[in-house]
Amino acid sequence: MADKVRQFTIYRIKNLDRAEQEYYRTLQRTLDKIEDDVIKLAGRELPTQAGKLIELQSAIAIRPKIRTILQTEFLGWANTVTKKGFNRQAKRIERAFKAIGNIPVEFQELTKGDLQLIRNLKLQTFTQFKDISNTFTKRLADKVYQNTLVGREFVELEKELRQTINGIYSKSDDREAQKLVSFIKANKNKKSMQSEVDKAVATLQSKFARDRAGDNMLKYSSQLLNDGLREFDAQVNAKKSFDAGLTFIKYFGDIIPTTRQICRDVLNGRYRKRKSNLFTIEEVRQLWQRQSWSGKKSGDPLVVRGGYNCRHQWTYVNPDWYDKEGNLII
């Protein structure tokens, strides 16, 4: 008998992966446009003499124009993620509940309470994207002012602005560097290409002095995209499960080389309490409280799971769905 609990949990996870990849690609295009628009704005609005920035008044006046660019492009993208992306995942959760069955029919569909939670989570995540927009509006405007104050060359300001937006993936006039950036962008999310991507990143770091871990808009946006999608799924799934009276949980997902040890151990049954590898909610919370690891995120483990960029998910079940040997029998 097919394990439909596993099947539909993996269905949720795989579609989260696809959604993240889709919106990461559109994020890249959005930030590339922001990068181009900000540089064009700076080139148009900031006077120079012998290539050096010379007028503080223009540097101050540019701030609201930078804000408009980020609000138009970035918040437009964020609105699509939190509306279209979240709605799609909510419908997948509903489909999984209907397919697994064995709970009251009224809880298999999205209820009024579920829809209210979905609206709240959309607003919460969009507000976090808005915070990123405001933060980087200030950082970009500050860089314009600071570089103008000391009369630096425009080309130096351009480099700082580009890397503040896209970090290691910012555009470059150097043909070899730009070729590496394009390759990394195209293959970053392909597991089969990770070795080649890492080599390209290493070349950018060593030969072109690019900083992979720097504070940039792409870094924070992609992190929130990942966590926002997966934590939305976790919270809506938990709400529906609690309403349906499901109080046991099981962990699902792939094990890959970068899988954290805590996730690997739970999936492999190191902390198994039952043959089915089910846990009570309290057992999971106590386990997470006792453990410490790199990338651990504060919050309820039912939501944050293994931490930043974790791609595993909990599914809520009834222990009566399993026999004494731990096999699913529904």
Residues of each region from the PLM?
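Acidic, glycine-rich two-metal-ion catalytic cores of nucleic acid-processing enzymes
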Residues: 196, 212-323, 327-328
